[in-house]
Amino acid sequence: MEGPLRTPPIDRSRELLKTAREEIFKSVNGVDLPVYIWEPEPDKAPPYPKSVAAFFFSSGWDNGQIAQFAPHCVYFASRGMTTMCFDYRVSARHPGSGPLQAMADARSAIRWIRMNAVELGVNPGKIIGVGGSGGGHAIASAAILNGFDDPSDVTDCSPVPNAVVLFNPVMDTWSRHAPYQDRWPDNASRKAADLYRGIKAGFPPMLIMHGTEDRVVPFDGSYTFARKSSKKKNICRFIEFDGKGHGFFNFNLSFEMYEATLMAMDEFFVELGFIEPDPNAGLGKDEAL
């Protein structure tokens, strides 16, 4: 006799996605790419156009879950921001797609926010791009590299985010240690998309977080990028998480690491003037009520 039916575990991130408003930010060959949007409650919203946190899920450009950063979105909406989870093309859902398409979609996403800033009630000069792994490369490339635009984009509108937060990002695409080398259509594009080659002064402020035991995307790629970028007088905060592997920051993997990285982001956003300090920070539950 079979045992009792087991209720499948709830994917909390996917459940949180249902609390967002869905819009279409881009259509490619008849396929719509959605963005999920969270707004702050009226008592949490600032009396001026809001800052935006735009999230791009982790991937190796083959697959990924758009709901991954939904917990982050809910939190930062509670801090007075408009938050968004953007879809972008990966090969599992869009055959033939790869890193170049992801890069183009990230640029399109930032432009979409700027071009619709009035309707969205947001500040087009306070857009933070956030991404992990291949999604981190996509949004970082919008901040660092020229080109890689979608032919349908209005290129007069800047795709450069005003700040960037990266989780175990792919920064190195060209060296022999670079991950996911087989995902590129050719060596020329892999070399052109290498973020090391774009390092110069004038980058938007960045926060990079990476686990030292990452066996998927090498830790040294982020560490070396942060060091070289800082030498160009850019703001490039780097936090290493000793003994942590790939994806250590995810809500469903480790709440402790999720919370630690979330607070690092919060402090970074406050430092940049994108949100106000949390008046309840450091208070116990009863004190914060």
Can you say where each PLM-predicted feature lies in the sequence?
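Acidic catalytic loop of the alpha/beta-hydrolase fold
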Residues: 173, 213-217
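N-terminal cap/lid segment of alpha/beta-hydrolase-fold proteins
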Residues: 1-48
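Catalytic nucleophile-loop/oxyanion-hole region of alpha/beta-hydrolase
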Residues: 64-73, 84-124, 252-259
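Short substrate-entry loop that stabilizes the transition state in hydrolases
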Residues: 44-50, 56-96, 137, 215-216
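C-terminal catalytic histidine-bearing segment of alpha/beta-hydrolase fold enzymes
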Residues: 36, 96, 219, 223-289
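The conserved beta1-alpha1 loop
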Residues: 56-59, 113, 210
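Primarily recognizes the serine-hydrolase "nucleophile elbow" in alpha/beta-hydrolase
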Residues: 108-183, 190-191, 195
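Short beta-strand/loop motif that positions the catalytic acidic residue
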Residues: 202, 208-210, 214
